[in-house]
Amino acid sequence: MRIPRIFHPDTLTPQGGETDLSEDAANHVGRVLRMSAGQALQLFDGSNQVFDAEIVQAGKKNVRVRYAAGQTENRESPLHLHLGQVMSRGEKMEFTIQKSIELGVNVITPLLSERCGVKLDGERLEKKIAQWQKIAIAACEQCGRNRVPEIRPVQTLESWCAEPDNGLKLNLHPRAAHSINTLPLPVSRIRLLIGPEGGLSADEIAMTATQGFTDILLGPRVLRTETTALTAITALQVRFGDLG
């Protein structure tokens, strides 16, 4: 049986010790997995270390574990990827976040654009961002990453594109002259823009060009927004990262 991996939001002592799991983790371990004292876990706290652990006490609302000294396990790609994803409807955004993290994305910023079909504000938006961060944690627990990517607050497309960045800035465009295979080597940082289901407006495309974004073409077929993100990330990891 595979040993469950559990994220711990507080820094763990490198030499080992005891700690109570977070409320979310305790609920997952105690109620969902139905684990009990004596069973093994693996903890990670975002420091790129993993900690072998054993449950010493398991109640309905509290789980306490004893953990050994940490061991460094770096599973991060040499390519730093910042995904700017215009928010999509329903579960599509959740799917994009989950799979992008499995593929090695480091930062995700949800974006608002002219043709964005998602209308969220205030408390609903805060709850959605918290939910997306939980999805990011669960994705890391599943795929073996020991650093949890950041889900940043929602921004407008214009403000995100205007942020200083010393990496390569890419925007997918169906009539672009460049493909990923024609991009120059080496590249260690990329800011990747994925537009909404209806695409970016002409003014938005022009704006990305003034902000230093390079238009690239993925291929001859039209992809859905959630497919576009994952296809682009995979291709970039194959060329510049740790896939393939």
UniProtKB/Swiss-Prot annotation:
Q: Which GO terms describe its biological process?
A: rRNA base methylation
Q: What reaction does this catalyse?
A: uridine(1498) in 16S rRNA + S-adenosyl-L-methionine = N(3)-methyluridine(1498) in 16S rRNA + S-adenosyl-L-homocysteine + H(+)
One of its Pfam families is: PUA_4
Keywords, sorted A to Z: Cytoplasm, Methyltransferase, rRNA processing, S-adenosyl-L-methionine, Transferase
Q: Which GO terms describe its cellular component?
A: cytoplasm
Q: Which Enzyme Commission numbers does its entry carry?
A: 2.1.1.193
The record's section on SUPFAM superfamilies has: alpha/beta knot, PUA domain-like
This protein's source sits in the domain of life called Bacteria
Places the protein is found = Cytoplasm
Q: Which CDD domains match?
A: RsmE-like
The cross-references to InterPro entries, in alphabetical order and at most eight, read: Alpha/beta_knot_MTases, PUA-like_sf, RsmE, RsmE_MTase_dom, RsmE_PUA-like, tRNA_m1G_MTases_N
User: Region entry Disordered: which residue ranges?
Assistant: 1-21
Which Gene Ontology terms cover its molecular function?
rRNA (uridine-N3-)-methyltransferase activity
Q: What is its main location?
A: cytoplasm
Complexes and interactors: Homodimer.
Q: What family does the database annotate? A: Belongs to the RNA methyltransferase RsmE family.
Instruction: List, alphabetically, the NCBIfam families matched.
Output: PRK11713.1-1 (NF008690), PRK11713.1-5 (NF008692), RsmE family RNA methyltransferase (TIGR00046)
Function comment: Specifically methylates the N3 position of the uracil ring of uridine 1498 (m3U1498) in 16S rRNA. Acts on the fully assembled 30S ribosomal subunit.
- State what protein this is by name: Ribosomal RNA small subunit methyltransferase E
Q: Gene encoding this chain? A: rsmE
